[in-house]
Amino acid sequence: MYYSSGNYEAFARPKKPEGVDNKSAYIVGSGLAALTAACYLVRDGQMKGERVHILEKGPTAGGACDGWKFENIGYVMRGGREMDNHFEVMWDLFHSIPSIETEGVSVLDEYYWLNKADPNYSLCRATEKRGQDAHTDGKFDLSDKGAMEIMKLFFTPNEDLQDKRITDFFDDEVFHSNFWLYWRTMFAFENWHSALEMKLYIQRYIHHIGGLPDFTALRFTKYNQYESMILPMVKYLEGFGVQFHFGVQVTNVEFDCKSDRKVAKRIDIIENGERGGIDLTENDLVFITNGGCVENSSMGSQNTPAPYNTEIKEGGGWDMWRKIAAQDPAFGHPDKFCYDPEQTNWMSATVETLDQRIIPYITKICKRDPFSGKVVTGGIVTVKDSSWLMSWTINRQPQFRSQPKDHCLVWVYSLFTDKPGDFVKKPMRECTGKEICMEWLYHLGVPVEQIEDMAENSANTVPVMMPYIDAFFMPRAYGDRPKVVPDGAVNFAFLGQFAETPRDTIFTTEYSMRTGMEAVYTRLNIDRGVPEVWGSVYDVRDLLDATVKLRDGKKPIDMELNLVEKMALKKVLGKIEGTDIEKLLKEYHII
């Protein structure tokens, strides 16, 4: 496997890999990484579909990329997906996946046309004082000291960030800024999370710094992530004859491990309550989704809280990974990520409006008609003075094809599930759907005397607790996640957010899909490049642009400097006078 960039590799079709007709594949899990691996097995690996087996413990495919209506409960979207135009692997695959809505076009075509015709941007990024605009006004509001703290992290070598927390690099100069309000609510970072991952995020999206305050950097699918992404992939795979095995719990993968050679020998399973297994040869390839951000997630209802279940049990991704990791140090250290759910949990809730009473309060804040079929909030609206640090968003409606035309679906999430609310004086994790809706309505500015009635009769709210949703953000060191293909691996690879691949950032669709592509390309030795992570961090234009925009348009040369620094700067500017360097610095408002 090798990385590439540019159209030469992107548009090429690889030859059929040698020996592929003698191989079979077993994929543990059916999330985005797993489905991506399956797609590349049949598309570029040209493996026969009937030789590809997807083992899924649940009743449907998709993993964390869900979207479902549960009978007698309501619509549920555990999360949402924010996409980037430089998700190189994602678009490499989705240009081949046919739309299930429009004949003759791809998922990428649909997505591209939609976001060109209806570009995303927010008209209100944050509120305070019960629905009033917090007037962040597109500003990061960073002091010179805060900007320098970010700069220091940006240039710190990865090796020096092992097991470090964000609090080791930032103080209140950053934490009290709009920058941190935007950042942690958009990406679900907490102050105690990994400094390494924080650095990787800044570098990965340096080309989008200017688009973070108003979300012009983002793009979204037409419907929820399940209907817009997962279903087309499933239909594509079914067309090749790929075998989906639902209700199959993988409890372990057994290996024969030597210092220089590691072979997967058996997959241990539970199916229909019976223990069994799949014996493997070296021609049987195993792709393992280890860990899981939505493991142990639980659902409540309008009148019941979502249980907070933290016990790791057999048959789930964490227990399986623990058993795998016990067999060889190269298979990672799962307990670095799942040891303390108090540091990794947050909650979401899906609110379905049932009439028009709530809509005017939404419209007042987002300044758009929620039923226009176009962008509504344009990303999350964060309630700046919320004790739960609540954010909410409304994507283009409808979010489900089955959704009533006069109903609006709102996604609400909060990072602090253990804090009492501002209206409902209970922690979010103890609240029913109705009570979470009441807290949200309070922050919309609904008159207090109308809140309970609206939450009960004008909305149906379904809460979801996810104890390990931020597990991948926990401080880590190299080796804590197994490489996608560990050294010496003969017939297996790891997939998903807890597999190690360089430069990319977790909690993204691209990361999952990248691990799937890299795993298949390595195991089948496919002779075509995997698109490298977009290299904006190496583009001086993006670096200069981000430097100015992070400081809200202020030139770096206007920072407070001592006499020696001023003299040095004057000398440097004199040296570049009349050169292309001077022109470039002026173009990007550095000088």
Please provide the spans of the model-predicted regions.
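Beta1-alpha1 glycine-rich phosphate/pyrophosphate-binding loop at the start
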Residues: 1-3, 37, 41, 45-85, ...
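C-terminal segments that line or cap access tunnels to active or ligand-binding sites in enzymes
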Residues: 207-221, 283-285, 290-515, 521-538
